[in-house]
From Swiss-Prot:
Residues the entry annotates as binding ATP: K29, V30, S31, G32, G72, R76, T179, Q180, Y185, D188
Activity regulation statement: Inhibited by UTP.
Subunit structure: Homohexamer.
Record EC number: 2.7.4.22
Keyword Transmembrane: no
Cellular component, GO, one term: cytosol
Pathway per the UniProt entry: Pyrimidine metabolism; CTP biosynthesis via de novo pathway; UDP from UMP (UMPK route): step 1/1
Protein's name according to its UniProt entry: Uridylate kinase
Family that this chain belongs to: Belongs to the UMP kinase family.
Catalytic activity: UMP + ATP = UDP + ADP
GO biological process, alphabetically ordered: 'de novo' CTP biosynthetic process; UDP biosynthetic process
Length: 263
């Protein structure tokens, strides 16, 4: 049974603290845009360092962590294709952007003493390991953070789908999606103040209402493997720790109702 994450503003530990982790192993999906901070392009080192500290605290608390980072802060394949580029070539460029972000996050984590491995779906052994599932699992069992780069290694698949695939392969208890807002809304709350916010959603509700928190293939893969998706604000201080402890403001997506009721 899936339990909702509750808002810690009502009860729980004091500010700046969080309870014991509720998940043994999780995949954290971070958008490339999240790494920009207040910049319009590229990687903001202060933002990468802050996210690294959150991940380090989670590992220290006993949670096994793996990450998938998008590449939209550097290059987005769909945008390139929309401007006339060959879609496959544009997607490969986007995959290379995720490798750059993964290396930046690895550097941020290792700078604070967290052993980290980058595994790429596109082999580039000079800079990182190739993706090998059993090796990635062993890394996490030894307390290392694993960052999966280059998406699925195939064009026409998003990094959301790559995150869902890796979460299923790694046997993760949840996929945590760190975004720019504190959950799933009916519309972009930054442009529509009347957008409805959801605390809980069924997988099928996300698909039938076209809420676009993740692409349909990613949500379907999570549904088929019964892995909950937790959407939270990656920029909120201690946001990751609170979500891992079953607290904090977020949206939980999972098996909330029967398939017949969800349609």
């Amino acid at each position: 049974m899936l339990h909702a994450v509750t808002d810690s503003s009502a009860s729980g530990p004091a500010d700046g603290q969080a309870g014991a982790p509720k998940f043994r192993r999780v995949l954290l999906k971070v958008s490339g845009e999240a790494l920009m901070g207040s910049q319009n392009y590229g990687i903001d080192i202060d933002t990468a360092d802050r996210i690294a500290r959150e991940v380090a605290a989670a590992v220290k608390g006993g949670t096994e962590m793996c990450l998938v980072i998008g590449g939209g802060n550097i290059f987005r394949g769909l945008s390139g294709a929309a401007k006339g580029m060959d879609r496959a070539a544009a997607d490969y460029m986007g995959m290379l952007a995720t490798v750059m972000n993964a290396l930046a996050m690895q550097t941020a984590l290792e700078r604070i003493g967290v052993q980290t491995r980058v595994q790429s779906a596109i082999p580039m052994t000079t800079v990182c390991e190739p993706y090998i599932r059993r090796r990635a699992t062993r890394h996490m069992e030894k307390g290392r953070v694993v960052i999966f780069a280059a998406g699925t290694g195939n064009p026409f698949f998003t990094t959301d789908t790559a995150a869902a695939l890796r979460a299923a392969e790694m046997g993760c208890d949840a996929l945590l999606k760190g975004t720019q807002v504190d959950g799933v809304y009916s519309d972009d709350p930054r442009t529509n103040p009347d957008a409805e916010r959801f605390d809980q959603l069924d997988y099928l509700d996300v698909l039938t209402r076209d809420l676009r928190v993740m692409d349909a293939s990613a949500v379907t893969l999570m549904r088929e493997n019964a892995i909950p998706i937790v959407v939270f604000d990656i920029h909120k201080t201690n946001g990751l720790a609170r979500v891992l402890a079953g607290e904090g403001k977020c949206t939980m997506i999972g098996k909330m109702k029967s398939d017949a009721a969800a349609v």
